[in-house]
Amino acid sequence: MATKETGGQKHATRRNQEVEEIEVTTETSVRNEKLAEDVDDILDEIDEVLESNAEDFVRQFVQKGGE
């Protein structure tokens, strides 16, 4: 019977699948960490812009509201 798998073949296949899953998980984790760092950098830039422009925004709002 040529189609019958032996226990060793199944075990090797499972082990290969586990190794592939671990590699994919590691790659995904590294990619997620990089994306998280990029998002943090962008949020920091947004905070800086908001802080520098907030004073001007408030002045304009007060002037318009006071007119």
Swiss-Prot record:
Residues 23-61 are annotated as: ARC ATPase binding. Keywords: Coiled coil, Isopeptide bond, Ubl conjugation pathway. InterPro entries: Ubiquitin-like_Pup (IPR008515). Pathway: Protein degradation; proteasomal Pup-dependent pathway. The N-terminal unstructured half of Pup provides a signal required to initiate unfolding and degradation by the proteasome but is not needed for pupylation, while the C-terminal helical half of Pup interacts with ARC to target proteins to the proteasome. HAMAP family: Pup (MF_02106). This is Prokaryotic ubiquitin-like protein Pup. It comes from Thermobifida fusca (strain YX).
